[in-house]
Regions:
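Glycine-rich phosphate/pyrophosphate-binding loop and the adjoining helix
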Residues: 60-101
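Helix-loop-strand module that forms the ligand-binding subsite of alpha/beta enzymes
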Residues: 1-64
């Protein structure tokens, strides 16, 4: 299982996670044959409904290209600080996603 966890930076994943994803190129055929499961966990300060559109599209394209099985996404809208995150529904959503796996 591969879990992509990242804050949202300029409507995409962090540079650190993007570096890891870019390194997949050398292992595409190996990853493709393994039929791994994947999930996306992300948070952002913004709470507009379009906040995660670009990251969702990138994740879904990556999952399709590498032949991962998407197990779900937790998109944490309005999680700009740890206290904002704790006060929201997203920690529980992440917990439930983890339990379902």
């Amino acid at each position: 299982m591969v879990v992509f966890a990242t804050p949202l930076y300029y409507y995409g994943m962090s540079a650190q996670l993007k570096t890891v994803v870019d390194r997949f190129c050398a292992y595409n055929s190996s990853l493709n044959r393994r039929h791994l499961k994947s999930a996306l966990l992300t948070v952002a300060w913004n709470s507009q409904d379009w906040t995660f559109e670009a990251l969702e599209a990138h994740y879904k394209t990556l999952v399709r290209y590498i032949n991962f099985e998407d197990m779900g996404m937790v998109l944490g809208y309005g999680c700009g600080t740890p206290s904002m995150t704790r006060a929201g529904k997203y920690p529980e959503m992440a917990y439930k996603l983890g339990r379902s796996l």
